[in-house]
A protein has these predicted regions:
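Short helix-coil boundary/hinge micro-motifs
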Residues: 34-51, 59-74, 208, 219-221
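Short acidic-glycine loop/turn motifs at beta-strand connectors
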Residues: 58, 107-111, 235-236, 255
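Substrate-contacting helices/loops that form the catalytic groove of nucleic-acid
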Residues: 65-202, 282-329
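Acidic carboxylate diad motif detector
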Residues: 1-58
Length: 329
């Protein structure tokens, strides 16, 4: 059952729900320590507001899945003369790289969101507990396993929401018109042993980011990620080599450019979309063309960059990112 704002009234520690027998008040079940919980992150933060919610019954208990919304204020990038670089006919792209280890999502604006290693660890914990309950084989164990399965997917779903929210925040802050993701089909080919869970998680993050970004008029697109992890993202370098990347460090063997490998990939994914939007089939992977008369820009952590190499300094601050020395330029 879905509730809108008329049928559900949210308070700090309880919610009032309309039923066929009148309104029912239910208090939130909260842990002793609130730090780091979705309740502390969204309910206690007055910048977030309740939207719609869905009442779900798992055979044992009722759960209320609430959607939170927040309005962001977009920042502008200015060039050295102080002029706004984002005009009505311009296209500004935010590139996003999704990962199975390290940070779950990295954006070309320097946003580092989620912890894929922690996500994988939680997944292993859930699977281990489920295996123990299956071995027990009792009715009580079966009931607990069913309950844990519901808790498990709610946790992962909330985690996908959190990562998507980080991407949305970056996109709005830099005034992006488009957000570029890697096509999921290519992710599966690139990582042949990618578990179904990771495929589900990547798809969920993209879906949540897409519907959240629609509110701001920002369009999501998917691109072919060919060579995005191997190519140097500097606009004056055409080097594409597997030797450029070692773990989470990208070091170009041609020009010496050194940067976080996932950040480099996010930039290349953004450039790939700029190339796609140009409607030219013969644009090389070195991303050296723009979109004709329309001004095309890639949103970076330090400003905006055109495919031709034109740079404008920033007026925004990225969130949740490592130090500049760890990220690079």
């Amino acid at each position: 059952m879905t509730y809108d704002k008329r049928a559900a009234t949210y308070h700090r520690y309880k919610v009032s729900l309309a039923t066929v027998n009148g309104r029912v008040q239910a208090r939130y079940v909260l842990p002793r320590e609130l730090d780091g919980t979705p309740y502390a992150r969204y309910v206690l933060d007055r910048r977030w507001r309740f939207s719609t919610s869905k009442l779900v019954y798992d055979g044992d208990r009722f759960w209320l899945h609430a959607v939170m919304k927040r309005h962001y204020t977009a920042s502008k990038a200015v060039d050295e003369s102080g002029s706004d670089t984002h005009s009505g006919d311009s296209t500004r792209v935010l590139g996003v790289d999704l990962n199975v280890d390290g940070y779950s999502a990295v954006t070309s604006a320097g946003g580092f969101h989620g912890n894929a290693d922690h996500l994988n660890h939680r997944r292993e914990q859930f699977e281990s507990l489920r295996a123990e309950l299956q071995q027990t084989g009792t009715r009580s164990a079966h009931r607990r396993m069913k309950q844990r399965r519901g808790n498990e997917w709610r946790w992962f779903d909330q985690y996908a929401h959190d990562v998507a929210n980080g991407i949305v925040a970056d996109a709005v802050q830099v005034g992006a018109t488009h957000v570029a993701f890697e096509r999921l089909t290519h992710i599966r080919r690139r990582i042949s042993k990618l578990p179904k869970f990771q495929q589900w998680f990547f798809r969920r993050v993209q879906e949540y980011a897409e519907y959240k970004l629609k509110e701001y008029g920002i369009e999501c697109r998917q691109v072919n990620p060919r060579n995005t992890s191997r190519a140097c993202s500097r606009t004056d370098c055409d080097c594409v080599s597997a030797a450029n990347r070692e773990g989470k460090t990208f070091r170009c063997t041609a020009c010496g450019y050194e940067v976080n490998a996932d950040y480099n990939a996010a930039k290349n994914i953004g450039f790939a979309l700029l190339n796609d939007l140009s409607d030219s089939a013969d644009i090389p992977a070195s991303h050296t063309r723009s979109l004709g008369r329309a001004r095309s820009q890639l949103a970076l952590m330090s400003g905006t960059l055109t495919p031709a190499g034109g740079f404008a300094s920033r007026e925004w601050e990225s969130t949740d990112k490592p130090t500049a020395s760890a990220v690079g330029g």
